[in-house]
């Protein structure tokens, strides 16, 4: 696996692979990789002949009081994990390579509606930063397909909409969330948790399961289910940011006749903000 740091080197390497008739897969990351990221690369390797991954901690998607400076940078370990997962090329640019004229004059990509609410409410500008950097990376790599984790459910919806609306010829593949044995979704931010917080953390997924089970039994008072869930989270030591039942495609608030739903949440455990979601498809209407 080669590692390149400039757009020129990246494009030359991808052009060679494409010249050999290879299908290009792409996995953008911010590094500090875990088994969830490895699953994305493995999926890309199954669907493509040449896999490009990127590691770039994107300042444009971090708010003023967020963890940009303390976000872990673990390049050597990340390179080994990518190699084991089947990555062929790593693009690891500096901020100056991605934003040569500075971020203040950078053209932005904004996906309305889907970027609003949920994580967009508590992290204003976040999804504009995500859409902008992913759009730039897509133009740099020009992949046939790209793989994103379903744990970042709203992000995946934003990327799908951007690709559709801007007519990008890229297949977007969602990969199911990878979880620890106790149900906690794998996340780079789990490393911020104290041992006690790590023990409490699986309550987030259990709460989503509780709400989904109620819906599966035919309960349609979503507000009551959410209130129960918020009480569960608070009892487990969380400070809920949001906990909602939404339509899984449009992300609007769920209606009682919707068949495709997502129970989606963000909550703080100490100073660490965890997110998770649970998709459910209802086969038939419940009276």
UniProtKB/Swiss-Prot annotation:
Disulfide bonds: none
Name of the top EC class for this enzyme: ligase
Gene Ontology MF terms in the entry: ATP binding; pantoate-beta-alanine ligase activity
Record's GO cellular component terms: cytosol
EC number(s) stated in the UniProt entry for this protein: 6.3.2.1
Binding-site positions, ATP: 30-37, 149-152, 178, 186-189
Coiled coil: none
Catalytic residues as annotated in Swiss-Prot or TrEMBL: 37
Keywords attached to this entry: ATP-binding, Cytoplasm, Ligase, Nucleotide-binding, Pantothenate biosynthesis
Domain of life: Bacteria
Alphabetical list of HAMAP family matching this protein: PanC
Additional observations: The reaction proceeds by a bi uni uni bi ping pong mechanism.
Function: Catalyzes the condensation of pantoate with beta-alanine in an ATP-dependent reaction via a pantoyl-adenylate intermediate.
Self-association state and partner proteins as the record states: Homodimer.
Name of this protein: Pantothenate synthetase
Species in which this protein is naturally found: Pseudomonas putida (strain GB-1)
Lineage: Bacteria, Pseudomonadati, Pseudomonadota, Gammaproteobacteria, Pseudomonadales
């Amino acid at each position: 696996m080669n590692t390149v740091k400039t757009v020129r080197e990246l494009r030359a390497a991808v052009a060679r692979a494409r010249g050999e008739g290879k299908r290009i897969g792409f996995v953008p990351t911010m590094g500090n990789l875990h088994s969830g990221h490895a699953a994305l690369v493995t999926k890309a390797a199954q669907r493509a002949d040449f896999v490009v991954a990127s590691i770039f901690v994107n300042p444009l998607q971090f708010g003023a009081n967020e963890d940009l400076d303390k976000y872990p940078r673990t390049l050597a370990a990340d390179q080994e994990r990518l190699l084991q997962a089947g990555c062929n090329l790593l693009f690891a640019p500096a901020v100056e390579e991605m934003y040569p004229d500075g971020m203040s004059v950078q053209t932005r990509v904004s996906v309305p509606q889907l970027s609003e609410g949920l994580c967009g409410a508590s992290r204003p500008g976040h999804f504009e930063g995500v859409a902008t950097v992913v759009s730039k990376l897509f133009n740099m790599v020009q992949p046939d397909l790209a793989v994103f984790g379903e744990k970042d459910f709203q992000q995946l919806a934003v990327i799908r909409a951007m690709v559709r609306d801007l007519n990008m010829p890229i297949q977007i593949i969602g990969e199911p969330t990878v979880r620890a044995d106790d149900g906690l979704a794998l996340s780079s931010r789990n490393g911020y948790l104290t041992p006690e917080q790590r023990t409490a953390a699986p309550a987030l997924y259990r709460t989503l399961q509780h709400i989904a089970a109620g819906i599966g039994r035919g309960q349609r008072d979503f507000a009551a289910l959410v209130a129960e869930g918020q009480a569960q989270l608070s009892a487990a030591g969380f400070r809920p940011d949001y906990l909602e039942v939404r339509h899984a495609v449009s992300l609007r608030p769920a209606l009682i006749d919707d068949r495709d739903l997502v129970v989606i949440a963000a909550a703080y455990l100490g100073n660490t903000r965890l997110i998770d979601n649970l998709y459910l498809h209802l086969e038939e209407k419940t009276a």
